[in-house]
C-alpha cells in the first residue's frame, strides 16, 4: 500500500506525451513507464513484447521495419522507456525518488538521430572538418554519444536511428557494424585515423573511455548501449 501511495503521488506530477496529466489517463498504473516500478511480472505478460525485449537484451540491437506511418519509431521509444524504467526500479532503493527521476533519466538515456541521405561517415563516426582554418579530425555524432556514456551506468542507453533506410548503411556505419557485436564491445575495432590530427580536447575524452591504445584509435561500443 505504501508503494502504491508513493506511485500515486508521483503520477500527479507527470504528463503524457500530449500534455495530459498522467494521473488522469486511463489506468495510469498500467502505463508502460510506470508498471515496471510495481509489477515484477511485467515481462511475462506480453509474449510479443517479451520476445522483442529478450532479443534486444541478447543482441543489443534491433531493426524495426515496415511501411511509413506504422509506429516504428514510437514502438522503439516505448521499448526503450520500458527497459529503462525497469532498470531504474531494480537499481533504486527509494521508489519515490526513482519515479521522480524517471523523465530526466529517459531524456539522458535515449538518444535519437534523424538520418537523411546527406549523412556521411564523417558526420556519423569520425572525419575531417575545418577548425579555425585548420583541417582536423573530429568525432562524429555517434562517437560523441559513446564518449558521453558512463560505462559503469546500470541504466541502459538507447540509440534510436530514425529513417535509417534513407542512408547508405555500409558507407555511413563503417566499423560500427562490427563494433556493435557483443564479442567486440570490450576490445573495440581499430579506426583508420591518425590521432595526431585529432584536437587535444577530443583526445582526452577518447583516452578517458579507453578508446586510444598504442597511439591507435578504437571504436568501442559500451555494453550498456543498445540500438
At which residue positions do the language-model features occur?
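C-terminal accessory module of base-excision DNA glycosylases/AP lyases that mediates lesion recognition
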Residues: 2-46
